[in-house]
Amino acid sequence: MKKLLQAKALILALGLFQLPAIAQTQMQADRTNGQFATEEMQRAFQETNPPAGPVRAIAEYERSAAVLVRYPFGIPMELIKELAKNDKVITIVASESQKNTVITQYTQSGVNLSNCDFIIAKTDSYWTRDYTGWFAMYDTNKVGLVDFIYNRPRPNDDEFPKYEAQYLGIEMFGMKLKQTGGNYMTDGYGSAVQSHIAYTENSSLSQAQVNQKMKDYLGITHHDVVQDPNGEYINHVDCWGKYLAPNKILIRKVPDNHPQHQALEDMAAYFAAQTCAWGTKYEVYRALATNEQPYTNSLILNNRVFVPVNGPASVDNDALNVYKTAMPGYEIIGVKGASGTPWLGTDALHCRTHEVADKGYLYIKHYPILGEQAGPDYKIEADVVSCANATISPVQCYYRINGSGSFKAADMTMESTGHYTYSFTGLNKNDKVEYYISAADNSGRKETYPFIGEPDPFKFTCMNETNTCTVTGAAKALRAWFNAGRSELAVSVSLNIAGTYRIKLYNTAGEEVAAMTKELVAGTSVFSMDVYSQAPGTYVLVVEGNGIRETMKILK
């Protein structure tokens, strides 16, 4: 079992470590040629209406149906072979002739052709991360593609998303912003991180207007635009940071005497101080780049993580071990670049691949119970959505107490369509609970949350203490935080009496602006409240019933 829970590090021996400096300089020049989108590209871009709400950007660490690469390749053949072992590889080719050439190369290299498909479309470069579309859920249970103005003067690349959407059979939405995929990462809860070029390259718009478009088209209501700490020509977030999970982020680390050292340390401290969507501070992980190794420029593809490595081996192994520590249960695979297209500090594996979301995604939304919490009982909730319009069954909570034995499965109760609950009962003080949620549907899909399930479950400790007072502001009894997008208010409440409670939200004028009724346990319950339509400002949250009234002030 222990071996099953450990990530496996696999180094693929793929050619030389580096090109001569002159060749590296040429690659950088190719990537930045002309620097910005042409005026003709901007004029030709067709903006569409935004997707119907609710809109939610899909994170890289969620379920993927495939990965996009482009021929001629910027990645080694051994990487494609490894990708195609478990996942679908979609190769962009310019013609049937190119397709046949690639099939021959794949066959000769032992690539699993049953996991390969092709899109025939003209493109200008192999940086699929930068110009292919961004995926979002919309209209409750649909997956769509969001296009943008590619911020480089490559018209064929800029046109590609329409072919991508046609191939996938999904709706494409045109968001009239200059963007690039290497400068975008989202947590799946309404937050996105980008460097400052998200604003400076859209200088005709105010920052508020840029933020509004990100909200309308992607559901991003916390647009975290930061000054790029690398200070390089590219200004892409994937050159220094990466979301690994809703509560985990990887930040590049360099030696103390490196000119970027302080800026990167400041960035790590910035994220360590932020509250993630689960209500805890981010876990910040660091990968030391002793010689510009691009360790944050990795690809998460379902339960595997492909990390670019350049050597020396000891430094590579340290970086891979950081991933293994942060992502237990995932297979961590180190990949060396090809001799003709090596990994650079500002251009590596993530830049040259792009995950493709599952249009029939079985999505689980959950705000977990974490840390020390009052008991004796604990209630969790989850929303489960089938984007394939399939019948969902079963939805279960897998759990174990004090690390004893295997995880046990318990059916969750469907309280309303797509909304499920489960209560932990009979726990003792100091019991340590591990749990994850599992769902399946009749399309054959099965998902767990957290994504990896058993190797990295949610964990909480039962304190068996309930708050018996009814004094306003008892923080021990009532805690609330916004998801990163501030569209939902997550509430954790500890009570000494089980029963029906009314949860209400008041504005500063004393007007009730939102309300819901919940069955809560004697102990800790965690649930969420829709506050998407509420304006920024100060509110009072009230939980009352059964002779108990708990209140707290919150700022949106």
From Swiss-Prot:
Optimum pH is 9.3. Inhibited by cysteine and TLCK. Inhibited by high concentration of thiourea and thio-L-citrulline. The keyword Cell cycle does not apply. The keyword Transport does not apply. Keywords: FAD, Flavoprotein, FMN, Hydrolase, Secreted, Signal. It is an enzyme of class 3 (hydrolase). Residues 1-23 form the signal peptide. Its cofactor is FAD; FMN. It is found in: Secreted. Pfam families: PAD_porph (PF04371). GO terms for cellular component: extracellular region. One of its GO terms (molecular function) is agmatine deiminase activity. Residues 24-43 form a propeptide. Its EC number is 3.5.3.-. InterPro entries: Peptidyl-Arg-deiminase_porph. GO terms for biological process: putrescine biosynthetic process. The active site is at 351 (amidino-cysteine intermediate). Deiminates the guanidino group of C-terminal arginine residues on a variety of peptides, including the vasoregulatory peptide-hormone bradykinin, to yield ammonia and a citrulline residue. May promote the growth of the pathogen in the periodontal pocket by producing ammonia, ammonia having a protective effect during acidic cleaning cycles in the mouth. PANTHER family: AGMATINE DEIMINASE-RELATED (PTHR31377:SF0). Belongs to the agmatine deiminase family. This is Peptidylarginine deiminase. It comes from Porphyromonas gingivalis (strain ATCC BAA-308 / W83).
